[in-house]
Amino acid sequence: MVLDLDLFRVDKGGDPALIRETQEKRFKDPGLVDQLVKADSEWRRCRFRADNLNKLKNLCSKTIGEKMKKKEPVEDDESVPENVLNFDDLTADALANLKVSQIKKVRLLIDEAILKCDAERIKLEAERFENLREIGNLLHPSVPISNDEDADNKVERIWGDCTVRKKYSHVDLVVMVDGFEGEKGAVVAGSRGYFLKGVLVFLEQALIQYALRTLGSRGYTPIYTPFFMRKEVMQEVAQLSQFDEELYKVIGKGSEKSDDNSYDEKYLIATSEQPIAALHRDEWLRPEDLPIKYAGLSTCFRQEVGSHGRDTRGIFRVHQFEKIEQFVYSSPHDNKSWEMFEEMITTAEEFYQSLGIPYHIVNIVSGSLNHAASKKLDLEAWFPGSGAFRELVSCSNCTDYQARRLRIRYGQTKKMMDKVEFVHMLNATMCATTRTICAILENYQTEKGITVPEKLKEFMPPGLQELIPFVKPAPIDQEPSKKQKKQHEGSKKKAAARDVALESRLQNMEVTDA
């Protein structure tokens, strides 16, 4: 995931100041731009020198051939005049004045210079790339500039009644319908581990089927993705920080051969966006085939580093969940990708409207965008039991930022175009099932249970098409209040004190009797 290097090159029409400004608006280090420009300038000089050295090497070989044809003596003289050692000014005439043995020596020296130049070029290329991959995409003009998403995310629109309050939160409701095993899940899988069971398994499958049907009717091709990716491919779709904060590493045998002792490093996917982004890696996509729209279905795995203490109960924020994703490859021309961006968020909105989930759409501030996103809109549902908006959907246009690293090009072949262009890539959540279940539970709770949303009834089994009944008490109703806890602790202390006093009196009585 990177920007076009020509954007940093003034002689190619680029504007480093614009990228520096983008970094500042993202509240990231603008000095990376200057470091990249410096490394790139030195790299280009190094490559120019290497090209000239290779030309000189070929000239040496050609001159030797001409002299051999003339049957000039080879001799053993390998001394090289000082003026010839300055390869930048070496000419064909200067070489012609040398003996064959001297030219051979010059060619060897040129070989050494080429090797040295190549080593320097590789070093500069690595330095340039280290800076390039940490510089974010150019921002869309409509992105709010701020580093505080809690205060400055811009609400674009609201749908439904986002003021209504209800009694229970999803943390209690998943227990009340007996659809969740949290403590046992944590024993088996660790923190945030869970078993989804019974009615919530049916509700999850209903959401998956309804989401896939909805996207299928809009021209999306359903696709079930791999759950893990090779390290070198994941590096092309994920930014560096994700490897530390989000992705799980999987170590396995290098091959299926029993005598193979090598090991292979893979990463579990955090979203189906990652493998779908790599689906057309190293391909040319024809204009007439675009847009290509995929409805990705996968299990997702996230470490959630940095989320310590947040949403530790229930199924809203977990390490493993199912998700249906919109993913689109679009033309880079005529504002097509931005039209698609609006279409994708609209598709998500219509899905949640059909489920009767109130929400608002927020334009995410620049400081909270990942490197790839030029703009991101979130759909945050209203949770009436929790009294809060919670994110269900993220919709991003990454323009050509991802495609450039993956080498997914637009058009026929390089020969047909003046300059290689790259497709635009967009992604949007359709339904992260556990989060959507939480939203449904809170919005559709009644005194007796959870009313099944109209659109999901046909996907639910007999007996659960109208109402998911409560079969257990709410945990919050079983927990003693702080006052009750304090009174109970006080009573325990008083009782303990009485026991000590009684024991003391009994001992005194025994002494007196004796």
From Swiss-Prot:
Short sequence motif named Nuclear localization signal, residue ranges: 482-494
PROSITE patterns: AA_TRNA_LIGASE_II (PS50862)
Catalytic activity line of the entry: tRNA(Ser) + L-serine + ATP = L-seryl-tRNA(Ser) + AMP + diphosphate + H(+); tRNA(Sec) + L-serine + ATP = L-seryl-tRNA(Sec) + AMP + diphosphate + H(+)
SUPFAM superfamilies with a match to the protein in the record: Class II aaRS and biotin synthetases, tRNA-binding arm
Cleaved signal peptide residues: none
Chain intervals with Polar residues compositional bias: 505-514
Region of interest (Interaction with tRNA), ranges: 9-61
Positions with biased composition (Basic and acidic residues): 479-502
Residues found modified as N6-acetyllysine: 323
Binding residues annotated for ATP, in chain numbering: 302-304, 318-321, 391-394
GO cellular component: cytoplasm; cytosol; nucleus
Main location as per UniProt: cytoplasm
Keyword annotations of the record: Acetylation, Aminoacyl-tRNA synthetase, ATP-binding, Cytoplasm, DNA-binding, Ligase, Nucleotide-binding, Nucleus, Phosphoprotein, Protein biosynthesis
Record-linked InterPro entries: aa-tRNA-synt_IIb (IPR002314), aa-tRNA-synth_II (IPR006195), aa-tRNA-synth_II/BPL/LPL (IPR045864), Ser-tRNA-ligase_type_1 (IPR002317), Ser-tRNA-synth_1_N (IPR015866), SerRS_1_N_sf (IPR042103), SerRS_core (IPR033729), tRNA-bd_arm (IPR010978)
Enzyme class per UniProt: ligase
Family: Belongs to the class-II aminoacyl-tRNA synthetase family. Type-1 seryl-tRNA synthetase subfamily.
Purpose: Catalyzes the attachment of serine to tRNA(Ser) in a two-step reaction: serine is first activated by ATP to form Ser-AMP and then transferred to the acceptor end of tRNA(Ser). Is probably also able to aminoacylate tRNA(Sec) with serine, to form the misacylated tRNA L-seryl-tRNA(Sec), which will be further converted into selenocysteinyl-tRNA(Sec). In the nucleus, binds to the VEGFA core promoter and prevents MYC binding and transcriptional activation by MYC. Recruits SIRT2 to the VEGFA promoter, promoting deacetylation of histone H4 at 'Lys-16' (H4K16).
Domain notes: Consists of two distinct domains, a catalytic core and a N-terminal extension that is involved in tRNA binding.
NCBIfam families: serS (TIGR00414)
Name of the protein in its database record: Serine--tRNA ligase, cytoplasmic
Organism of provenance: Macaca fascicularis
GN (gene name): SARS1
